[in-house]
Amino acid sequence: NKNLYDGVTLEDVKSSLVMTARTLVEKEPNYTYATARILLDNIRSEGLTYLGMQTQATQPEMEELYPEALKKFLDQGIENGILNPELREMDIERLGKAIRGDRDNNFTYLGLQTLYDRYFIHDNDVRYELPQVFFMRVSMGLALGEENKEERAIEFYNLLSSFDYMSSTPTLFNAGTQHSQLSSCYLTTVPDDLHGIYGAIQDNAMLSKWAGGLGNDWTPVRGLGSQIKGTNGKSQGVVPFLKVVNDTAVAVNQGGKRKGAVCSYLETWHVDIEEFVELRKNTGDDRRRTHDMNTANWVPDLFMKRVSEGKSWTLFTPSDTPDLHDLYGLAFEKRYEEYEAQTETGEIDFYKKIDAKELWKKMLSMVFETGHPWITFKDVCNLRSPQQHVGVVHSSNLCTEITLNTSQDEIAVCNLGSVNLTHHIAEGKLDEKKIERTINTAIRMLDNVIDINYYAVKAAETSNMKHRPIGLGIMGFHDVLYMLKTPYASEEAVEFADRSMEMVSYYAIKASSDLAKERGSYSSYEGSLWSQGILPIDSIKLLKESRGDEYLDVDESSTMDWDGLRETIKTQGIRNSNVMAIAPTATIANITGVTQSIEPTYQNLFVKSNLSGEFTVTNIPMVKTLKDLGLWDSVMINDLKYYDGSVAGISRIPEEIKKLYACAFEIEPKWLIDAASRRQKWIDQSQSLNLYINEPSGKKLDIMYRMAWLRGLKTTYYLRSKGATTSEKSTIATGELNAVSATAEPLAAPLPDACSITDPDCDACQ
């Protein structure tokens, strides 16, 4: 009653109902669906009123109204200058009849609120796009280039609206609009001249404007103190330019939705590397700090070998060693050692010799202290790249899952989408037939994005049309482990990671090959690993030949008919240069109501903040299990709050249940790395892999990151660390237990807005 008063508006009453209902979620997680229904009622009222239809509608009425709502939405969106007028030329009556209004009931509160806050098309903050119209608009946009537009749009709609698969955020934002920028990731190489440097920064601004996430390779730019021949002066190095990149990302907001997001990469032999690793520190000269930009190390195998062998490492300026940037594997090692020899003879006089282990320690201490630079591995990305015949992978992207060639002439682009694994389990195992069906449609949708995409920069269009890379990923991995009653920290989970990714990989590659039969192979196909019958599983051999057996520990088992698929590709070709990448999926996992990507559950109960305020999120499978055991009550809720969403310290919960519902910090990093290693053998790009460590130490970090390298991982993402002090609790004077952290973040270094695992707003790779 306290929310009701004389003069209260209907909108305030509706808002109060939602807020009241969502407070009940912590006691009974199914209230998330009840809250979503109340919110749905409000959304319908807002949208239908704007479209001039009626002020509210029940569920059965809405199922009747959806065809008309679609028609009016298209008319209004085109009139407002937002939607592509070509949508109106499709058979709207047929599409309207295909809408499944009952699927409105599948949303959790968080999923629907996320769509309302961030995705639905609006006019002066009034949303007039209804949930199923949203999915149909995206599907129509993706079908514009098809011959059978309506048939394909309905096929795409059924995949999205059933939550079997979800396109990435830029695709959901912009498909079917006047500016159809549907791609998630852009990768660029910055040349070593002033014109090229500022051209790259301008490209960043233009690409970021339309919600793309950026990865920049800065290795070619000469180091601090090296000579500039044109002026006979000394270079200020990479860092001052990175400060400009940082401030540009802040200044350019993504279509009014959020500030731009960028990650800068530097190779470990660059003379500026010691300053580069400190860019995110909160102390020191602020003119040489980038507080809003992500950074990543691009580490060659030779450096890791030198660390292991306790040897020295030489830093060069790229203006003296220009070819190192384009070399990898044994060719890099040979040339690097030749340059080292030239320092002995005096041919190269600008260099710095350091202890490899000392630099490694500094890299690890900065990753712990600031969360950056991330650790990513150059040689494995190149040696296992299908496209090594036409270029070099010089960096990854904003979320470290994309590994595509870049050069001064080519900006790499990748379009993402993720299969919801929880919808592909039947009778306790993977539903192979459904996985094949889902992936066939998903690959087609991703390939369509390339042709209908809006390209803000010509070099991006050139490379995307030439190579046609896409990135199919997965989400809901930990939810599936719950369904299978399998703890993440187990050999069974590692084996499931292997078999599930093998199946996704097999059908993704097959679908791209089948699409090539229909549409033709991508233009740079000849000479690729694909054309030689070398699939991702086969490229491990190339890595082993370069690195040596003693520095590689990778499982190479397989279960599917890969020989048959090799023959199919030789006959049909393949449509896309790269087919798979596992993105973080933070936002789209919220929409579909599953665990993010390959992430372990962060906490079993926590308070989430978004544009609509704070609300509790609980682990629904865990609550169901505890209910079955008669253990779910108010005391359990308070215990979970007290222990920050962890079940480990609650004595009345059986041990096997504690193992099953262990949170991220309770799972040894070994298990995450082993599962990632098994997946990586099947993936032609990479995976966004966050690592979690409880009570970190230099030794633990050293073991963890060296293990990641030895297991053949291409990239790692954030390091999440939690000190011993964060688990200490005290009872407040009132006797109430401490509330769980409102952000569900560990006590670690402040992180940027980009791609935080508990930030539902990251638009780049999700």
Model-derived segments and spans:
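Often metal-dependent polyanion-binding catalytic scaffolds in large enzymes
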Residues: 1-128
